[in-house]
Amino acid sequence: MTILFLTMVISYFSCMKAAPMKEASVRGHGSLAYPGLRTHGTLESLTGPNAGSRGLTSLADTFEHVIEELLDEDQDIQPSEENKDADLYTSRVMLSSQVPLEPPLLFLLEEYKNYLDAANMSMRVRRHSDPARRGELSVCDSTSEWVTAAEKKTAVDMSGATVTVLEKVPVPKGQLKQYFYETKCNPKGYTKEGCRGIDKRHWNSQCRTTQSYVRALTMDNKKRVGWRFIRIDTSCVCTLTIKRGR
């Protein structure tokens, strides 16, 4: 498990080191930048001859530092008032020459953290905390998969404008495809008629797909290409309304 985790971390940061890192504005009027990368310092310090090695060393000193950097990443950009119910996620976008075989690294890091927490429990406590043993089920059935920009074609950005999602991103040695890890309600699941575990005598329930913002390379209606935050499907939640007349 530890060896697999180490391999994923090294591969992930190798991709970050190979990807272009230039200044980019949120609304897409800047230059090309790697999505989801948290930059430190000035632009000159990022584009110097040793910028990639410095960033790689500072982030990969220990497993704990890597987890802290990715799980506690802070976003200062806020959605507009119209889209204030949406969150910001940058880990659901990946640049790759082929369809990714695993969920985003941040998801795997969370699973690894849970694995470490479970390792510190006694066998009895571990069995008791296992959701499968307690009979726990999700309120709404969902499905997750990687989709390409060719499947999305268009999306809504943070200003509410419809933009074109570009299928390929230029990199120094060619082009990579943009992949988005989307989560939505499962139309073939057992909760398509309502949320699981809800008292239907008193409540109307519905499983609904919600969206969050991720950073992607897009083009607006004025043919301006840049990195913008767009909305994609990221979760399936239960919505409730009380039944009247009871």
Swiss-Prot record:
Propeptide: 19-127
Keyword DNA damage belongs to the record: no
Cellular component terms (Gene Ontology): axon; cytoplasm; dendrite; extracellular space; nucleus; perinuclear region of cytoplasm; synaptic vesicle
Signal peptide: 1-18
UniProt superkingdom: Eukaryota
Glycosylation sites: N120
Cystine pairs: C140-C207, C185-C236, C195-C238
GO annotation terms (biological process): cell surface receptor protein tyrosine kinase signaling pathway; modulation of chemical synaptic transmission; negative regulation of neuron apoptotic process; nerve development; nerve growth factor signaling pathway; neuron projection morphogenesis; response to heat
Main location group: secreted
Glycoprotein in keyword set: yes
Pfam families according to UniProt: NGF
Entry function: Important signaling molecule that activates signaling cascades downstream of NTRK2. During development, promotes the survival and differentiation of selected neuronal populations of the peripheral and central nervous systems. Participates in axonal growth, pathfinding and in the modulation of dendritic growth and morphology. Major regulator of synaptic transmission and plasticity at adult synapses in many regions of the CNS.
Similarity section: Belongs to the NGF-beta family.
Name by which UniProt lists this protein: Neurotrophic factor BDNF precursor form
Organism (species): Gallus gallus
